[in-house]
């Protein structure tokens, strides 16, 4: 393959962007909590909010960007509204967030900047009453309202639902609620199950475990 052909192929791929080093929820299986504390502290300290100039370069080169943190949540980037304003309306972007800690006014501005080229994926694992069992400190009922607000602003909304033991009984209800509210329900069978007491308590029944090396994702109401 010639170099120019290689570059064009890479350009078509979606690259994941860990836009910040901040998150306000305390998910027990997150890298922030399962990694050596000194190592993760160094990683957080040595990182920060992605520079706008870097965002511009990524937008220029790639056809798609996926804002999804491994140690952060993109909406906590101090200038995330400016990040949204830099995105190319002729390309595609996805913002993955737990959704907590932002005002209605902030979301109205974010959705105004998003348009049809930005998909918002809200990590709500179960219905609002069960999601904070794993996503500790998540304001789940407020997140639910922001998901509905996004729909009212013609934003494409994905309800990203990681299946745990405490929410697998709500899946059928979630499918119906997604239809009613025009959400795309994305059921995620996770592979992140270390052999420890916390993970074993959260682990769902066998039918909801991924059989692959990566997470299994099934979408409804596309």
Where in this protein do the model-derived segments appear?
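Radical SAM enzyme [4Fe-4S]-AdoMet core and its adjacent flexible, acidic
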Residues: 6-7, 18, 33-34, 38-53, ...
């Amino acid at each position: 393959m010639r170099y120019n052909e290689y570059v064009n192929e890479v350009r078509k791929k979606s690259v994941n962007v860990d836009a910040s080093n901040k998150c306000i929820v305390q998910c027990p299986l997150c890298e922030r909590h399962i990694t050596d504390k000194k190592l993760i502290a160094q990683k957080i300290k040595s990182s920060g909010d992605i520079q706008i100039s870097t965002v511009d370069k990524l937008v220029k080169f790639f056809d798609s960007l996926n804002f999804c943190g491994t140690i952060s949540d993109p909406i906590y980037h101090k200038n995330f509204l400016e990040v949204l304003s830099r995105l190319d309306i002729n390309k595609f972007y996805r913002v993955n967030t737990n959704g907590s800690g932002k005002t209605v006014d902030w979301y109205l501005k974010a959705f105004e900047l998003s348009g049809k080229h930005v998909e918002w994926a809200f990590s709500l694992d179960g219905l609002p009453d069960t999601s904070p069992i794993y996503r500790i400190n998540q304001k789940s009922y407020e997140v639910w309202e922001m998901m509905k607000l996004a729909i009212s602003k013609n934003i494409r909304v994905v309800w990203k639902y990681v299946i745990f033991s405490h929410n697998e009984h709500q899946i059928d209800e979630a499918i119906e609620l997604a239809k009613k509210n025009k959400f795309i329900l994305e059921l995620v069978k996770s592979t992140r199950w270390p052999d420890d007491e916390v993970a074993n308590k959260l682990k769902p029944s066998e039918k909801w475990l991924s059989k692959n090396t990566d997470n299994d994702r099934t979408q409804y109401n596309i």
